[in-house]
Amino acid sequence: MNGLALLRAGVSPDDRISCGGALRVGNGIFHCHKRSGHGPLNLKQAIMASCDIYFYEMVRRLGYDQVAPVARTLGLGQKFDLPFSTQRYGTVPDSAWKLKKYRAEWTVADSLNASIGQGYVLANPIQLAVMASRIASGRSLQPRIVMNGTAPTANPLPLNPEHLAYIRDAMYGVVNQGGTGGRARLNIPGVSLGAKTGTAQVRRITMAERAGGVRSNASLPFKMRDHALFICFAPVENPRYAAAIVLEHGGHTVTNLDTPGIGRDIITYLLDRDRALKSLAEVEPTWGGDIATRMAAETAAYKSQISLVQGAQTETNATAAPTDAPAVEAATDAANSSAAAIANTAQPAEEGSREATND
């Protein structure tokens, strides 16, 4: 999306930005996900490496008002004609939007945050999938829940076809030429996947933490971990499918369960079901068995936990609840003692008699 906006604004795809890992703007420092930096990058290389500094600097020069219209053209901020009322439009911010909503001027920091999908930018998964489909097809495709009859004709996007082809090639490189999505490479002869990885940060990283070393997602509480994102389409040569995967608080913590692998498996299933199921059978033992086995184990574990909780509650209630049991027990003991005394007085004990037992 940002790449298309840059090309549309006249940026040459061969222009290079040197990434040193951080960019100072005023009193603030904006960091790249690669702390040591990527070095000099052109547009395709920046997309493949998911370099934050490249897009920070380019959008700083142009302003985010050049990017927002392209974002809307690709489906962000849109409500689609779908049969449910729970859609959230998200937000594609710009200077006019901020002035209207907050009565505040747009800042350079706002542009930098928005350039990597942070700050005020909000998007839902279906918008991301639509964006992937429009980049792949070059048309203003609309999502539908049920396929029936002939699909409506989608108009071409008001974007340069050469620019779209360039971005598709860069997304091919993300997966197949050493980019960040290499684990999404398809194992289907003659079929390639184009994609873009992403991360949605959900917490603020302080300067003190950066100085001491940013904590890994795996070391954070679940709710503080980043969301992992992935959009893709395939086949690159003649796209048929597009998808968006959002793994909430996934944080890119488990490689073989990360979004690129999920995207690969979904597309493989759509294009070659037998191959996908064979691959699934090979990997399922590492997850604890097939889906039926895993669900049975989870159900048993859940029931076990419920039993333990109920048992603990029963013991607590029995101990804590007020009761007449001590008084009843004392009265019973007194009555038994009196009866025994009377019996002993009335009749001598027999030799060899034994105490009563419960057999």
Predicted features along the sequence, with ranges:
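Beta-lactam-recognizing serine transpeptidase/beta-lactamase-like catalytic domain environment
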Residues: 1-247, 255, 298-310, 314, ...
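Short, gly/Ser/Thr-rich active-site loops of penicillin-recognizing serine hydrolases
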Residues: 152-155, 168, 260-332, 337-338, ...
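Short beta-strands and strand-coil junctions in structured, solvent-facing domains, enriched
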Residues: 251-253, 272-273
